[in-house]
Amino acid sequence: MVAQALTTLNQSLDIRIDIDWPVLLEQRQAVLLHTDVPAYLLLPEVHQLIDAARQDNLLLMMNTLWHTGARISECIALPPNHFKLDVQQPYVSIQTLKSRGRPKRGGQVKPRLVPISDASFVRQLERFIKTHQVKKHDRLFPITRSAANKRLDRLIEKMTVKPSINITPHTFRHSLAVNAIFHGTPLPVLQGWLGHVDIHSTLVYTQVLSLETYHLMQRIQF
């Protein structure tokens, strides 16, 4: 089973980075105030929000946004046959529906490939497709962007502890980008995952590290 193989692989590789989430949460207000980084959630907050979902279609939609960085229009257009889950390194093929700059010769932008490394998400996808008998060319989430926004709003309204920032489906995309930066993902890789034509669009997310330079100042003698 691919999901089991991923679990074993993640356990065998020492790829965890120790991140102080409370400190980053404390810094977020200043980061959002003084930089161009769009509003984002930190990993523990994303987990809290996703765990609050009771409907499996909303749960999977949020997980898909979080794990792939897809725009909501791209996410709700995804059919099962865009996911390749029965391989050693699962991935999803996402058709970029928004791009800036001069279009490439030939017109339509080629789909981008985004790896899926989380075994539990792979299992969730497999289970959802099987349980709901979603045909390979049908959309996983046959809803509109407006409906997706409303479902997320209703979920947040029911939460006892509400997030401290305004959340839309696009927030998951920003949150993945910030999370990838915190975990040391190379910018060209992140650019590819997000489908940015111009890497300067990706560079914006590095500003989340603005307050992570304290240790460099400590080296200086005054």
Across the structure, where does each feature detected by a protein language model lie?
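N-terminal DNA-binding recognition helix of tyrosine site-specific recombinases/integrases
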Residues: M1-Q27, R71-S73
